[in-house]
Amino acid sequence: MAPAADREGYWGPTTSTLDWCEENYSVTWYIAEFWNTVSNLIMIIPPMFGAVQSVRDGLEKRYIASYLALTVVGMGSWCFHMTLKYEMQLLDELPMIYSCCIFVYCMFECFKIKNSVNYHLLFTLVLFSLIVTTVYLKVKEPIFHQVMYGMLVFTLVLRSIYIVTWVYPWLRGLGYTSLGIFLLGFLFWNIDNIFCESLRNFRKKVPPIIGITTQFHAWWHILTGLGSYLHILFSLYTRTLYLRYRPKVKFLFGIWPVILFEPLRKH
């Protein structure tokens, strides 16, 4: 976490329960944590295109919701790091729980008939979200949120490992790439927290262009945003493969991964 001696800017005093290692208002008076803010674009723009593509392809609404949920997380995180206000912190952290619940639902419903609804699982996840929200609003303890979020991510990891081990082994590349990128982001998140003072001292001694590369919370956004996006692709690939849609991972402009569907063969 950041040392206490940070300047104020356009949004006034910090009211959030967390303040990250990036120096506040060091780039512009209007954005508290500039790099932590703009790094959220990876969680906003690509998932929006994914949602539009899912609508065009006539995919199940749960996957449209997955893309949109990731976009909401990115927008909430943008608002939080831009302002460092408690209300905006909630707009970041609570959607992280809700989006993961959507991901969990999708992963555990991959092998059901099309457009089926598991009301028991749906009720359980909604109840879990309500309990976490209620408790977190009362205790205001970030560690509680982090543990609850970690539980959901761990559930997704176990389910993904099951799928690539026992169901579709040829999806290991996509599944493990998603997991590896996410874990690398988690490593950077910890480095940013544990070595914050050392990182700040280092930035004072090097050119700004080098200092930018040590904004590890921004890297956390980039890597977990990409990892989450790839997880949606993995979940969607698994689901549509089960439904015999003939999915294929293609790279838009040779860079960005998307899922396209080959036409069904006519006999």
From Swiss-Prot:
Ordered alphabetically, the record's keywords are: Calcium, Disease variant, Endoplasmic reticulum, Golgi apparatus, Hydrolase, Leukodystrophy, Lipid metabolism, Membrane, Metal-binding, Sphingolipid metabolism, Transmembrane, Transmembrane helix, Zinc
Parts of the chain on the Cytoplasmic side:
1-33, 83-87, 140-141, 195-215
What compartments host this protein?
Endoplasmic reticulum membrane; Golgi apparatus membrane
Q: In which tissues is it expressed?
A: Ubiquitously expressed. Highly expressed in placenta. Expressed in erythrocytes.
Q: Which Pfam families match?
A: Ceramidase (PF05875)
Annotated binding of Zn(2+), by residue: 81, 217, 221
Q: Any stretches that span the bilayer, and where are they?
A: 34-55, 62-82, 88-108, 119-139, 142-162, 174-194, 216-236
User: What membrane topology does the annotation report for this chain?
Assistant: Multi-pass membrane protein
What is the activity regulation comment for this entry?
A: Activated by 5 mM Ca(2+) and inhibited by 5 mM Zn(2+).
User: What is this protein's pH dependence?
Assistant: Optimum pH is 9.5.
The EC designation for this entry is 3.5.1.-, 3.5.1.23
Q: What is the effect of changing residue 99 to A?
A: No effect on enzyme activity
- Identification of the protein by name: Alkaline ceramidase 3
